[in-house]
């Protein structure tokens, strides 16, 4: 009965065959896992992280003039708001604004120093006056610590920042330098969330993926309008017919915020023409010192 029957024989797969199949499955999973990871990163990095309300994030260039200091004179709050509402020219300008704030607070000063053994010349340097200032912002403290570490004790007892030494450090650690600005924004963001001015909400992507989104309060929206108004006011200052005399303390704040907004040079030039003596009554002493800080922050 078995003569005409067809016989089927089953042989176990060899070890190599099984290994090859497993390898193919693993490669398939890894490939698509990689594709999904890249796709997810691209999608989520482009998702809206902030809700600016029905008025949106655009602030008109014709914002009404604002003659006071916005954001309750909080430089970091103004910096965060101006950055998110695209009012800033360059987010790196905050460094120069902080240095000007330190000069105003008596933490550091700008002085002239004679450099060179043969060809002597006057050079502006930053001198540290208070080595233990009361600084509450963590990233501001990091910047101050950096200046202290890159400073030298002069023969006259003054502790001055070594410009060349600081520049070389920044060149060698440029990634840390650039990440510092993001850290400043992150620290202020966390503070605004804690204060209830940024409201955390849940959003959904494709009805599956949930992520956090932060709603700007009306108060921060008003900050943005005021910052844009101050920027316009400072840029148009010479064109304003009915302008009031500026008090010294307000003049100092104007220059600090102008530096943060990236319009420092133009504003200083206007003020120097209108009020050539006012700067001498201020903590900056001369427009040359102000220009030095402006250039210092970029170098």
Predicted regions span which residues?
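Acidic, Ser/Thr/Pro-rich intrinsically disordered cytosolic tails and loops
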Residues: 1-299
């Amino acid at each position: 009965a078995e003569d005409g029957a067809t016989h089927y024989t089953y042989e176990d797969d060899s070890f190599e065959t099984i290994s090859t199949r497993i390898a193919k499955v693993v490669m398939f999973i890894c490939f698509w896992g990689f594709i999904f990871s890249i796709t997810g990163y691209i999608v989520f990095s482009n998702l809206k992280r902030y809700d600016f309300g029905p008025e949106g994030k655009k602030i008109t260039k014709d914002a009404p003039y604002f003659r006071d200091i916005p954001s309750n004179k909080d430089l970091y709050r103004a910096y965060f708001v101006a950055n998110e509402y695209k009012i800033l020219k360059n987010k790196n300008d905050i460094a120069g604004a902080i240095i000007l704030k330190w000069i105003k607070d008596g933490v550091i000063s700008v002085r002239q120093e004679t450099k060179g053994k043969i060809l002597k010349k006057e050079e502006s340097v930053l001198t540290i006056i208070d080595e233990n200032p009361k600084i509450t912002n963590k990233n501001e403290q990091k910047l101050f610590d950096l200046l202290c570490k890159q400073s030298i004790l002069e023969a006259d007892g003054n502790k001055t920042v070594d410009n060349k030494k600081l520049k070389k450090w920044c060149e060698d650690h440029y990634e840390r330098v650039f990440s510092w600005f993001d850290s400043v924004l992150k620290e202020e963001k966390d503070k605004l969330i804690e204060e209830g001015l940024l409201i955390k909400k849940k959003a959904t992507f494709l009805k599956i993926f949930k992520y956090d989104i932060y709603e700007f309060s009306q108060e921060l929206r008003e900050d943005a309008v005021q910052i844009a108004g101050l920027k316009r006011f400072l840029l148009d200052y010479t064109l304003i017919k009915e302008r009031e005399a500026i008090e010294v303390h307000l003049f100092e704040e104007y220059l600090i915020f102008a530096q943060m907004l990236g319009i420092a040079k133009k504003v200083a030039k206007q003020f120097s023409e209108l009020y050539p003596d006012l700067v001498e009554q201020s903590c900056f002493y001369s427009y040359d010192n102000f220009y030095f800080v402006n250039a210092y922050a970029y170098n």
